[in-house]
Amino acid sequence: MPLPTNQLRLAMVAGEPSGDLLAASLLGGLRERLPESAQYYGIGGQRMIAQGFDSHWQMDKLTVRGYVEALGQIPEILRIRGELKRQLLAERPAAFIGVDAPDFNFNVEQAARDAGIPSIHFVCPSIWAWRGGRIKKIAKSVDHMLCLFPFEPAILDKAGVASTYVGHPLADDIPLEPDTHGARIALGLPADGPVIAVLPGSRRSEIALIGPTFFAAMALMQQREPGVRFVMPAATPALRELLQPLVDAHPQLALTITDGRSQVAMTAADAILVKSGTVTLEAALLKKPMVISYKVPWLTGQIMRRQGYLPYVGLPNILAGRFVVPELLQHFATPEALADATLTQLRDDANRRTLTEVFTEMHLSLRQNTAAKAAEAVVRVLEQRKGRA
């Protein structure tokens, strides 16, 4: 059934950089399948804007982490959400697509759905890991879920939520065999000798909590592994400025800080010390041994621990269904423990070969041409809506 060609409008919201990446991928697929006159608007980042998206609010207004840290931003977030809902109900786009950011988007999606506007959510929340009660909220809010991981549709189906497995765009973008030598040349690193990539996060709260520990761990590793070099990507000038006091406090470190280029930095590495998050999946797709770590404020950690279901938090372990790389979280994330675990990952060649096999299988499973599959699923929802009109 052909879609209308007159001013098709889709509203979208992405709340953080990883969502911006996913939404931009989806927008690219939609632009190939929908009329050229179609308009896309809402809240998004620079990658979405590059795809012709009209962002009415700055995406970083929605970027928060944890329960405690969010308190100071609640009034501004609620104001933006209220304005967005009023705009949606007044303009009635063909659909609303929330990309990740479930705490913000589910409320908007429910308002859209209640008003007869199809609601689509891209990225299933980790209901299989923690906060399983969210599935009731999903059932009330979401007409169709776009899932990044293959085990999610079966969980949603039990709750009566329509969904499509679309794979992960990172698996499409990252080559099956990373070019470590080329990455080292690009960063001006020696072709030989051990390199460890260190990624302590991109938020001020993350750097404050785990940055000093990561730098202390690097200092220990340099003592124990002469000749080791470190590479650390800084996504923005503000992040580089935030890291500078830690760099100044450890002048002995053989450390290269790159302007962005986190994927190149990880590709150049023999092992990675990384904070928990989507970046751990990227490290797995690059076939890198790693140590996953994270620290959150005590209260946030207690809430997450009480609501957790799985014994692991890192995506490589979740997707494998077992511990394939070590996780050192909260008070277990000491400089000594991080240094020991990371050096083990660096030196253990048998483990490296095993991880390459595990991560290659994972990569092939997630490589689904996500932009095309997600866009096709959205088009089907639009066609179904037109058929009922």
UniProtKB/Swiss-Prot annotation:
Keyword Nucleotide-binding: no
Record's keyword terms, sorted: Glycosyltransferase, Lipid A biosynthesis, Lipid biosynthesis, Lipid metabolism, Transferase
Superkingdom of this protein's organism: Bacteria
GO molecular function terms attached to this record: lipid-A-disaccharide synthase activity; phospholipid binding
Swiss-Prot/TrEMBL catalytic activity: a lipid X + a UDP-2-N,3-O-bis[(3R)-3-hydroxyacyl]-alpha-D-glucosamine = a lipid A disaccharide + UDP + H(+)
Pathway connected to this protein: Bacterial outer membrane biogenesis; LPS lipid A biosynthesis
E.C. code: 2.4.1.182
InterPro entries documented for this protein: Glyco_trans_19
GO cellular component: membrane
Any single GO BP term: lipid A biosynthetic process
UniProt similarity note: Belongs to the LpxB family.
Functional summary from the UniProt entry: Condensation of UDP-2,3-diacylglucosamine and 2,3-diacylglucosamine-1-phosphate to form lipid A disaccharide, a precursor of lipid A, a phosphorylated glycolipid that anchors the lipopolysaccharide to the outer membrane of the cell.
Stated name of the protein: Lipid-A-disaccharide synthase
Organism whose genome encodes this protein: Burkholderia orbicola (strain MC0-3)
